[in-house]
Amino acid sequence: MADVCLRLQYACPWQSNMAAHGRQPVLSSTPLQILFHLNGWYFAAFFVAEILMFIYKGVILPYPQDNLILDVVLLLLFSGLETLRLFYGWKGNLCQRSLALFVSVAILVPCAVLSVYYLLLQTFVLRLEFVLNAVLLCFYGFELVLGVMTISIFSRANIY
């Protein structure tokens, strides 16, 4: 009877720290994966809100045309970088690859710089933009800390 209970205990994946098909521990960071998922949805809403705010600024405010074009091009660049960052972070965490996760952390730097640009350095910064970018920078801070911790865990593990 004790042998059956022992087998049932380790048959449940949430009670064991080992991978299903092997005996290697699962090192992926669940909080980091949750942050990647939430940040993906948040950035999609952020992108739509920024586009709508640029339309508002272009129509209502005396926004210089050259600055508006520059800000929209930077937003498109920001979107591409964020997509790459989330992809490499997502795959690096789930596949337990420190190089892909390092690329994600490296791409985090230009994304944070672009977020600071939209937070402080535009011609007109709306309050909504300030709040949205401040929340995005909080996401980046948490992802940086968890990403560096996860990279160190992956680097110390003996995965063959």
From Swiss-Prot:
One of its GO terms (cellular component) is cytoplasm. The chain crosses the membrane at residues 41-61, 68-88, 101-121, 134-154. It comes from Danio rerio (Zebrafish). The keyword Endoplasmic reticulum does not apply. GO terms for biological process: cilium assembly; convergent extension involved in gastrulation; non-motile cilium assembly; photoreceptor cell outer segment organization. It is found in: Membrane; Cytoplasm, Cytoskeleton, Cilium basal body. Part of the tectonic-like complex (also named B9 complex). Pfam families: Transmemb_17. Disruption phenotype: Ciliary phenotypes such as pericardial effusion, hydrocephalic brain, curved or kinked tail, gastrulation defects and other severe defects in left/right axis. InterPro entries: Uncharacterised_TM-17. Part of the tectonic-like complex which is required for tissue-specific ciliogenesis and may regulate ciliary membrane composition. This is Transmembrane protein 216. The keyword Membrane applies. The lineage of its organism: Eukaryota, Metazoa, Chordata, Craniata, Vertebrata. It is a multi-pass membrane protein. Its main location: membrane. Keywords: Cell projection, Cilium biogenesis/degradation, Cytoplasm, Cytoskeleton, Membrane, Transmembrane, Transmembrane helix. The gene is tmem216.
